Amino acid sequence: VAPPQHLCGSHLVDALYLVCGDRGFFYNPKGIVEQCCHRPCNIFDLQNYCN
């Protein structure tokens, strides 16, 4: 598992596409930016935003 990292902007969206794949994701900027851009997050945090 990759170490937690800061993901912001297009990097965050790209990571969501990678993690969620065909399931897609709901983009809630306030929640995910707080969790993954301001603080580092991991793949499990990202999976919480998949549909």
Swiss-Prot record:
Keywords of this entry: Carbohydrate metabolism, Disulfide bond, Glucose metabolism, Hormone, Secreted
Organism of this sequence: Pagrus major (Red sea bream)
Sample GO molecular function, one term: hormone activity
CDD domains in the record: IlGF_insulin_like
Functional description taken from the UniProt entry: Insulin decreases blood glucose concentration. It increases cell permeability to monosaccharides, amino acids and fatty acids. It accelerates glycolysis, the pentose phosphate cycle, and glycogen synthesis in liver.
Gene3D superfamilies in alphabetical order: Insulin-like
GO cellular component: extracellular space
Disulfide bond entries: 8-37, 20-50, 36-41
Subunit details: Heterodimer of a B chain and an A chain linked by two disulfide bonds.
Protein name, UniProt field: Insulin
Cellular location(s): Secreted
One of the protein's GO biological processes: glucose metabolic process
Family annotation (PROSITE patterns): INSULIN
InterPro entries in UniProt: Insulin (IPR004825), Insulin-like (IPR016179), Insulin-like_sf (IPR036438), Insulin_CS (IPR022353), Insulin_family (IPR022352)
Family, per entry: Belongs to the insulin family.
